[in-house]
Amino acid sequence: MECNLAQAKQWVSALDQRRFERALQGSGDAFQHVLAIVPLLLHLNHPQLPGYVIHAPSGIASFLASDYQKKWLTNEYGIHYADHKPSTLKSAVNFHEVFPPILGVYVMGSFGSISQTSSSDLDTWICVRDGLSLDEYTLLTQKAKRISEWAMQFNVEINFYLMDQQRFRNEHYADPLTIENSGSAQYMLLLDEFYRSAVRLAGKPLLWLHLWVENEKDYEKEVARLITEGEIDPNDWVDFGGLGQFSANEYFGASLWHLYKGIDSPYKSVLKILLLEAYSKEYPNTCLIARTFKRDLLAGNTNPDHHFDPYIAILAKVTQYLTALSEFKRLDFVHRCFYVKATEDFARYQANNWRIRYMEILAQEWGWSAETVKHLNKRPFWKIKAVKENHDNIMKFLMLSYRNLVEFARKHHIHSSVVPQDINILSRKLYTAFEELPGKVSLLNTQISHNLSEAHLTFVEVRGNKHFKDGWYLINQPIHHIMFSKERVIEYGESLNKLVSWAYFNHLLTEKTELSIFSKNVTLSTLQRFVTNLRQSFPSTIAKQPKNSDLLNQCEIRSLFIAINLTTDPTSKVEEVLTGISSRDLFSFGSLEQSLVGSIDFTYRNVWNEIRTLHFEGQNAILLALKVLSNKIYRGVNRPDSIQVYCYSERYRQDLRQLVMGLVNRCVSIQVGDIQQPCQTSRLRVAGKNWQLFFEDRGISLQEIGNESVCNEAESAVDFDEVLQTPIEDGETNQESRRYPPEMDAFASEGFLQFFFEDNSDHSFNVYILDESNHLEIYRHCDGEKDEKVREINQLYQNAKQEGDKNPYNIVQHNFNYPQFYQLQNGKNGISIVPFKFRQMNK
């Protein structure tokens, strides 16, 4: 394809202007103001201006201030800007005239596309010159952060990313993974997204957009040739390089990243992860959208079907892929996601808005009825059944794409390019958001509907019905309107505690909700008191995302709510009236020696911001509850911020509450290290039997006195002997063989397989393995390379489901319980634990 750079500049500039105009259509004055002023604030570093940081580098290459920017400077701050006389500002502005630190500023993503809405953020790349010092980089980062804070005053969210031109050539990841930064999860796929959507706000043009090369792997050679022959001056351009290094190794990390983004942007993520799936289908000859855009633009095709809109192009690519597979159900859901995303501001749009007009055309092409369009337009006001159906479909189709990409990686023996620390964080974020576990309260995506509150909620208990399994059912109608049927049920829970928690944390249950109950065991007044106590113990809104630092540690309990005798109350059937009894007699009461604690329910929020529930019932409920609690309060961790205990029994309410609260507080205090457990262990008499409680490193063990059988089951740990090749030495005593660094306790996390590497002086290493239940396995003096062990274990995990019974290591693969790897380091202050890092990254 022949194309001169002068002509290419005109076409690229025209496309920038076209996207810029589209971005402003439907946007408010505040958005337009921020967009106009941001480049100026990056260019200047004046004490009076927003974003000022003393000594911060400033100055954008080839910057020319607009009339709007000059007027704003003069009117707001009395500063007079001279375009061609930067020296006039030198006394007030840190101005880099000869070598500006900022080569270019570009906004990317949904900007100017059909998916842009009033709530869309501005993902902005700041390309800095090579050789910027660490101090300069830090100061410029601080300046960008302050500009972001200034923009938030106008309700405009800007995410700045400092980039250098070698980032993608070297695959270095200077910035850690955050809620907006994909870290090491993407390289070429991120560059593909940038090139297909970038709009230059200031600075130098992007060379790649102007230069066509038939084979992308020849891009660097072609650029070098043009420089040698004097056809281009590299100082006139910003060049992040070509897409020739694109590798299928990225699919795994990118799929995790888009699943993670799907927590907050579900409709967009359905499209993006499906694009990855479509890309993988074309492997190894993947046709990237950025290449398609550039080919059409430089060929002079200024009005292609995709309109140079990245999201319209994604839709076309995904449609072609799913149609070829005859997966029309998935395609219909993709259409719905696309429509919902594009019409997010439907209520604010005017009838002549180009986005609305385009979506009306697509709806007709898809053969939608007027009822379908009307239903989707009312999406912000959907109630629970429509929201649940939509939420379940989003989860189903996200996970289907993810599994297809995992299968693709397995089939082609692809290794992930994501570094272990990022995979640890990503997998734990996804585990908390997507993994369905017993007792875990599933939170519906808050982006689907604005208001799920219900005027009436009825809780129905079912026992011994051949048509319904035992448990609790929730219906969003008053009790006198109920014709109980499966069609009317909106949610099921094995325990009342979990069902009430689900309704409360998903905002169906509010202070205005009228409650009803149909149960032989729980009265309406008890239910109402329980709901009131739950509301007093927890805010209904949970913080969106846990911090990365929290995710790198174990999931400590942050807030704990305990309900005694909520669903089973032995005191209501007590016929003996005893006086002068000890509080401990309540666990072995009267001549029948029955425990007056019939049920205990836990509701707790952990530092990963999960809501979990536990239900214990029967004569040994108190013992089971204490044992499980001790396993979840890890040695040496912080004490929970709050522990609330409530009792709902008919009799002995305060006595039972005080007794259980005392035991719980003692259990917690021993586990966190507030008090030292004496050698003589605690004893309890429960339901006519004496029990001894042993407080150990990993929780309480229970033993009936006079009976040598220990209640806690001994489960065997995962056998990784063949991977690590060195079992525990025969000469070690059992006590010596079980010694492990106690610092590991702070990292123990349920649900994950964790590996801790410890280097020895003879260049071998020890490996401590904690399985999903935190059972410990130790391998000492292992040989070989740790990098290879990590890759081998990851491969074993990846193949676990396919190999079935042939899996020699008993790895249990769930959706996001990826093996986690850590390194123990000896320092002056003792042992520290850090995420494991490869010595050499895979390219």
Swiss-Prot record:
GO CC terms, sorted: cytoplasm
What GO molecular function terms would the record report?
A: adenylate cyclase activity; ATP binding
Please name one Pfam family that this protein belongs to. Adenylate_cycl
| Keyword Nucleotide-binding found | yes
Region Catalytic, residue ranges: 1-542
GO annotation (BP), single:
establishment of competence for transformation
Q: What induces it?
A: Expressed during exponential growth; expression decreases 10-fold on shifting to starvation media.
Question: What does this chain do?
Answer: Plays an essential role in competence development.
The text of the family note is: Belongs to the adenylyl cyclase class-1 family.
List the protein's name.
Adenylate cyclase
What organism, scientifically named, is this protein from?
Haemophilus influenzae (strain ATCC 51907 / DSM 11121 / KW20 / Rd)
